[in-house]
């Protein structure tokens, strides 16, 4: 950019990560990047004929009123292409893994309109994960969005890490992991584990962690999606998109909204919550050229499923996998709640009559057990009828069979990680429902893979 085209202004206000700047020559466009010293600022609002308000994407230390600001004339542009595989990036598409520069041939804006409905496809095909509780009770959709919903410490990140490992071995497409506002330590651990299992060469990682500016956390999801869309549209490959955590995306938007001076709505969230979430979620879809399958962790604050952030996220999901604190406290891992978890794929037309019938029988058995728990607590198991005792025995064995040792947690538990085919998981559940394992102790079914392991 030569000096005659240089659009320079000056900072007139600094409030945390919100910057106001005046441009006499030409007003920068919405979403344009501004550069002020070492700080990068994104334009969000035009305040007047000469003034813009933007949010900083990098630390603002050293900025002061009167500091010069340069309009770069473009939005955030990230590299796309196969050269990105095996690398770790920030919101600007700059590598942060100390592996040198990325020789990308193409850069794209992180902003793009969602694909038109007429161009979207609905595949209605199961996406097998190798995790019994998910595949049997809340199967994921290829090209759909699955949410892992739960409070703090119930195992969302561990489940996402296990999904990456399971899918890396048999999955033919590209995996893109997007870390939004999560712990740096977890990101670093995940990078090492993906490298160890040999899946890094088919994975791209994009991070804006807890310590970064809310503006960066708010935009990193769009940056990762831009990379995913390239593989779907240009390379015509399926993409697995993992997002940890959608709640942190909403939280970053709330921080930005407050600093921008917008009046909050319910529970202090930004009034534009639904729109902002939809801008991200509606870009995740399948077309004739490829599918983007998304698995998203959604933190549930104080285990409150009526929280507006969680309610709005629910609306975009085709499969909701709810993690239960109660099950986690009993040591039933993965702590997937079989009664609250739901999937639109669990229909006889998609999964077949046998799978649907087994899943409904599991739910019915576990629901009846739940109703009997109060009687057991007051009077004891012996006071139940013979039929009710059978229901309790089946339910307790099903609960234990649906637990599973993970490769991710091998070094904590000492148990070898197991990946179970859907057919084996259905076979095991069906045999338990037929009382084939009523004589076996409950613990023989705990933390195993296939049902035959209980006989050893």
Listing of model-derived features with the role each one plays in the protein:
Residues 137, 217-253:
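Phosphate-binding/switch loop-helix module in NTP-utilizing enzymes
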Residues 230, 248, 258-456:
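Conserved catalytic/coupling modules of large nucleotide/cofactor-utilizing molecular machines
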Residues 1-96:
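N-terminal accessory targeting/assembly segments
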Residues 130-182, 225:
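P-loop NTPase nucleotide-binding module
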Residues 170-173, 183-230, 258-276:
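Nucleotide-state-sensitive switch-loop elements of NTP-binding domains
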Residues 49, 59-61, 75-76, 93-96, ...:
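Conserved nucleotide-binding/hydrolysis micro-motifs of P-loop NTPases
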Residues 139-141, 166-171, 195-200, 230-235, ...:
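Conserved catalytic network of the ASCE P-loop NTPase/AAA+ motor domain
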Residues 67-69, 83, 96-144, 158-163, ...:
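P-loop NTPase nucleotide-binding/switch module
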């Amino acid at each position: 950019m030569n000096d005659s085209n240089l659009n320079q202004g000056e900072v007139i206000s600094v409030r945390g990560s919100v910057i106001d700047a005046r441009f006499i020559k030409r007003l920068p466009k919405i979403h344009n990047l501004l550069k002020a010293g070492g700080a990068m600022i994104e334009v969000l609002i035009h305040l007047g004929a000469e003034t813009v308000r933007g949010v900083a994407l990098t630390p603002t230390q050293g900025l002061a009123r009167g500091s010069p600001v340069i309009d770069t004339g473009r939005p955030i542009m990230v590299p796309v292409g196969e050269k990105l595989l095996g690398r770790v990036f920030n919101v600007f598409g700059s590598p942060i893994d100390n592996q040198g520069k990325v020789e990308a041939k193409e850069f794209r804006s992180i902003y793009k309109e969602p694909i038109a409905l007429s161009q979207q496809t609905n595949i209605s095909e199961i996406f097998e994960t190798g995790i019994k509780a998910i595949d049997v009770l809340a199967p994921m959709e290829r090209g759909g969005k699955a949410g892992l919903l739960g409070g703090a410490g119930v195992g969302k990140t561990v489940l996402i890490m296990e999904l990456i490992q399971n899918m890396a071995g048999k999955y033919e497409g590209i995996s893109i992991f997007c870390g939004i506002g999560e712990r740096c330590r977890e990101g670093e651990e995940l990078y090492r584990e993906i490298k160890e299992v040999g899946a890094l060469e088919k994975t791209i990682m994009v991070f804006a962690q807890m310590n970064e500016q809310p503006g960066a956390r708010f935009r990193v999801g769009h940056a990762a999606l831009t990379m995913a869309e390239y593989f779907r549209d240009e390379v015509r490959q399926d993409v697995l998109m993992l997002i940890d955590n959608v709640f942190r995306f909403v939280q970053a938007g709330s921080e930005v909204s407050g600093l921008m001076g917008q009046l909050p709505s319910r529970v202090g969230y930004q009034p534009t919550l639904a729109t902002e979430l939809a801008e991200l979620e509606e870009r995740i879809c399948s077309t004739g050229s490829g599918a983007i399958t998304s698995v998203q962790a959604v933190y549930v604050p104080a285990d409150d499923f009526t929280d507006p952030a969680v309610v709005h996220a629910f609306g975009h999901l085709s499969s909701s996998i709810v993690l239960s604190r109660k099950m986690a406290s009993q040591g039933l891992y993965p702590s997937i709640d079989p009664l609250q978890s739901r999937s639109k794929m669990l229909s006889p037309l998609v999964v077949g009559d046998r799978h649907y019938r087994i899943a409904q029988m599991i739910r019915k058995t576990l629901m009846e057990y739940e109703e009997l728990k109060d009687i057991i607590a007051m009077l004891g198991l012996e006071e139940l009828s013979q039929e009710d005792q059978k229901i309790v025995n089946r339910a307790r064995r099903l609960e234990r069979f649906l637990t599973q040792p993970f490769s991710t947690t091998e070094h904590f538990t000492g148990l070898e990680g197991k990946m179970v085919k859907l057919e084996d998981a259905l076979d095991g559940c069906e045999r338990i429902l037929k009382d084939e394992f009523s004589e076996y102790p409950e613990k023989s079914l705990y933390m195993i893979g296939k049902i035959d392991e209980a006989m050893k």
